[in-house]
Design a protein with these regions (language model features):
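Hydrophobic core of transmembrane alpha-helices in multi-pass small-molecule transporters
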Residues: 25, 106-123, 226, 307-321
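A late C-terminal transmembrane helix in Major Facilitator Superfamily
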Residues: 336-366
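Intracellular juxtamembrane helix-capping segments at the cytosolic ends
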Residues: 120-135, 321-334
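Central cavity-lining transmembrane alpha-helices of secondary-active solute carriers
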Residues: 55-73, 259-271
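Helix-loop boundary and gating motifs at the non-cytosolic
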Residues: 7-61, 229-246, 254
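Structural signature of the two symmetry-related core transmembrane helices
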Residues: 83-97, 180, 283-298, 377
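Helix-to-loop junctions at the C-terminal end of transmembrane segments
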Residues: 67-80, 167, 268-280, 364
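C-terminal transmembrane helical hairpin of 12-TM major facilitator-type secondary transporters
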Residues: 282-326
Length: 393
């Protein structure tokens, strides 16, 4: 696998960069086929109560953090990141097969989630490998990262509607087996087309214990991204059940809403990537938080499909900027620690799931699904407070 041709002739077809785009799309599809329907799967197929649904997401996030931090430490210190991604894809495929055929809550929680945690770690490891590839070949890392993020968003345009179509039209078994196929194809693409980039001595020094620079700002950014992703996780857990059980709207609307938001995220990410150096990452994050506040306020009062779909523009601005800027913000605050920075960012998503799982389960069990959006608004206000204290980079 070569790295030099891309730098020597950037205007010719670049097989490696194209492979990165396809792998980003496939890792996105694998997740987009599973996550949007998980709360509905647990409710309808596993017959879990709202509190148990929330606990499942919380437990999943805790296990995921332990797995991803362990893998990030090893990947930053030694070894071939490419082989690690293939290994993660293989375990992700096994997790999908287990979810396809098993309906025992505790087996899914402890065995299925353990396997799927490795599968989901393939995505941040791919982004870390892409950052190293961009740095070594002289590519503009910010825009390349945004293009990869756009591929994940494209997968989420297709994934949620397809997931609901497969689950409702056929079965959850068919849906999970489709995700397993995505992992198999992804692993094959990584093995045959992505570069092997051995760690040099200078890079092997990096550790995962803590950022070597900007520790206070990294901690603030961790809190900011955790709260923002937490609100998004509340939405993903709660929205399908809110749409179906409280608003009594068609099941497919939930998938269409997620797909619409993901489609609008693509131009949002690209525009944010273009303006990142001109406006600064902090200002863009402020714009995202403002859009998020308006979005969740709108979810409290919206009841018609047209309004719910219209609100997805605000959701796209919120998640589109967060999804692209957040990762780069961590990498800029932690130079020389690409794997740790990327995985630390990914763990804000997982910690967000921990918070969201607990809040969503308790709120739905005690009050209703509508009440969950009030918690999201409170979390966004806390995000604003943290954002006012972080420095720009």
């Amino acid at each position: 696998m070569h790295n030099t041709p891309a730098a020597a002739s950037p205007k010719t077809f670049d097989l490696t960069s194209t492979a990165f785009l396809i792998v980003a799309f496939l890792t996105g599809i694998a997740g987009a086929l599973q996550t949007p329907t998980l709360s509905l799967f647990l409710t309808d197929e596993v017959h879990a109560r709202p509190a148990m649904v929330g606990f499942f997401f919380t437990g999943s996030a805790v296990i995921g953090i332990l797995v991803s931090q362990f893998l990030a430490g090893r990947s930053d210190k030694k070894g071939d990141r490419k082989k690690l991604i293939v290994f993660c894809c293989a375990l992700g495929m096994l997790a999908c097969v287990l979810f396809a055929w098993n309906r025992n809550y505790f087996i899914l929680l402890f065995v299925g989630v353990f396997l799927s945690s490795f599968g989901s770690t393939a995505n941040p490891q791919m982004f870390a490998l892409a950052r190293e590839h961009a740095d070594r070949t002289g590519r503009e890392a910010v825009m390349f990262s945004f293009i990869l993020r756009a591929q994940v968003s494209l997968a989420w345009v297709i994934g949620p509607p397809l997931a609901y179509a497969l689950a409702m039209g056929f079965s959850f078994t068919v849906m999970y087996l489709s995700a397993a196929v995505a992992f198999v194809v992804c692993g094959a693409m990584v093995w045959f087309f992505l570069p092997s980039m051995r760690k040099e001595t200078a890079l092997a020094i990096g550790t995962l214990e803590a950022p070597r620079r900007n520790r206070r700002d990294t901690l603030l950014l961790f809190a900011i991204c955790t709260l923002m992703w937490g609100t998004n996780s509340l939405y993903i857990i709660n929205m399908p059940l809110f749409i179906i059980n409280e608003l009594h709207l068609p099941e497919k609307l939930a998938g269409v809403m997620m797909g619409t938001a993901a489609g609008l995220e693509i131009p949002t990410m690209l525009i944010a990537g273009y303006f990142a150096k001109r406006l600064g990452k902090r200002l863009l994050m402020c714009i995202a938080v403002a859009a998020g506040f308006c979005f969740y306020a709108g979810m409290l009062v919206a009841h018609s499909p047209v309004v719910l779909l219209g609100l997805q523009l605000l959701n796209a601005i919120y998640i589109g900027i967060l999804g692209g800027i957040g990762m780069l913000y961590f990498q800029d605050l932690m130079p020389g620690q690409a794997g740790s920075a990327t995985t630390l960012y990914t763990n804000t998503i997982r910690v967000g799931w921990i918070i969201a799982g607990s809040l969503a389960g308790i709120a739905a069990e005690i009050w209703n699904y509508h009440a969950v959006f009030w918690f999201a608004l409170v979390m966004i206000v806390a995000t604003m407070a943290c954002l006012s204290r972080i420095k720009d980079v």
